[in-house]
Design a protein with these regions (language model features):
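Bacterial signal peptide processing site
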Residues: 21-23
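Bacterial N-terminal signal peptides that target proteins for export
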Residues: 1-8
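C-terminal motif of bacterial Sec signal peptides marking the signal peptidase cleavage site
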Residues: 16-19
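Short acidic/proline- and small/hydrophobic-mixed sequence motifs that coincide with surface turns
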Residues: 36-39
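A short, solvent-exposed beta-strand micro-motif common in secreted/extracellular proteins
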Residues: 69-80
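Asparagine-centered strand-capping/turn motif at beta-strand->loop junctions
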Residues: 27-34
Length: 119
């Protein structure tokens, strides 16, 4: 009886730890403009991911922990010195996310694709 109670407690503890595991977010920033991106910063959930030297028709990637409800703050600086900034997208705990962030010459667009639920 004592062993079975310990086993049940261990299972409950393991399930609790699994449910508290941080979810992951990944993004691909695609340069769809005609100009090289000198640097880009993507901030979300208190984390900032820096990307550099993204040529036209190429991309860079980043990842973060989904530990808040929030949106991306994206800042792009082109090689010419021109900048674009946008707050967009949405993440929430309990899901993993895979996003494509497309940078054109005049806008930043995002495609949100939750990848699974951690229930």
């Amino acid at each position: 009886m004592k062993c079975s109670l310990l086993g049940i407690a261990a299972i409950i503890g393991a399930l609790f730890l699994i449910s508290c595991t941080a979810n992951k977010g990944n993004f691909t920033l695609v340069n769809k403009s005609m100009e090289p991106i000198a640097r880009a910063s993507v901030a979300i959930c208190g984390q900032t991911i820096e990307l550099k030297a993204i040529q036209p028709d190429t991309s860079g990637t980043g990842s973060y922990e989904v530990k808040c409800e929030g949106h991306y703050t994206i800042l792009v600086e082109f090689q010419s010195g021109r900048t674009l900034q946008k707050e967009t997208g949405y993440v929430t705990p309990g899901m993993d996310f895979q996003h494509e962030i497309a940078v054109t010459g005049s806008d930043i667009e995002i495609t949100q694709q939750p990848t699974n639920s951690a229930q």
